């Protein structure tokens, strides 16, 4: 039957020796009151810089991984075509109707008025969408970085 030792015990079984645990840069810990403040795990395992960083910034790392996961989900969902109904493609010489189901009256109206707007929409609307997408991509990055920095700042 094993006898439990108190935390302030300085016997050879409680203290790690360099023969049984060869650790680079290990310093001999004298038996003192500071040893009673450490846990047995802290006596055995030396402090690791990476572990300290992970402990200090755990929520910031989780938040950044969550933001990356949301960004990847956005990329995936934006790559899936959302047009399930009929739509049309027109070239200068032909007009083709694609899709499932009955043809939408709006599609027919867009085909009849293709001289006014060759691709079924106003060129100004397409330009506005491209300008907005150019402006919103850096803003989302700035928002994500500021959110990461806000979470990683120590209180």
Curated annotation (Swiss-Prot):
Residues 81-130 are lumenal. Belongs to the virgaviridae TGB3 movement protein family. The keyword Ribosomal protein does not apply. Participates in the transport of viral genome to neighboring plant cells directly through plasmodesmata, without any budding. TGBp2 and TGBp3 are necessary for intracellular delivery of TGBp1-containing vRNPs to plasmodesmata. Can gate plasmodesmata and increase their size exclusion limit. Induces host actin cytoskeleton network thickening, which probably plays a major role in virus cell-to-cell movement. The genome of this virus consists of three linear, positive, single-stranded RNAs encapsidated in separate virions designated RNA-alpha, RNA-beta and RNA-gamma. Three proteins (alpha-A, beta-A and gamma-A) are translated directly from these genomic RNAs and the remaining proteins encoded on RNA-beta (beta-B, beta-C and beta-D) and RNA-gamma (gamma-B) are expressed via three subgenomic messenger RNAs. InterPro entries: Viral_beta_CD. One of its GO terms (biological process) is transport of virus in host, cell to cell. The 2nd transmembrane domain is involved in plasmodesmata targeting. It is found in: Host cell junction, Host plasmodesma; Host endoplasmic reticulum membrane; Host cytoplasm, Host cytoskeleton. The chain crosses the membrane at residues 60-80, 131-151. Interacts with movement proteins TGB1 and TGB2. TGB1-TGB3-TGB2 complex formation is enhanced by ATP hydrolysis. It comes from the Viruses. GO terms for cellular component: host cell endoplasmic reticulum membrane; host cell plasmodesma; host cytoskeleton; membrane. A motif (Involved in plasmodesmata targeting and virus cell-to-cell movement) lies at residues 89-93. Changing residue 155 to A: Reduced cell-to-cell movement. Residues 1-59, 152-155 are cytoplasmic. Its main location: host cell. Residues 150-155 are annotated as: Required for attachment to the host plasmodesmata-associated membrane compartments. Keywords: Host cell junction, Host cytoplasm, Host cytoskeleton, Host endoplasmic reticulum, Host membrane, Membrane, Phosphoprotein, Transmembrane, Transmembrane helix, Transport, Viral movement protein. It is a multi-pass membrane protein. The lineage of its organism: Viruses, Riboviria, Orthornavirae, Kitrinoviricota, Alsuviricetes. It comes from Barley stripe mosaic virus. This is Movement protein TGB3.
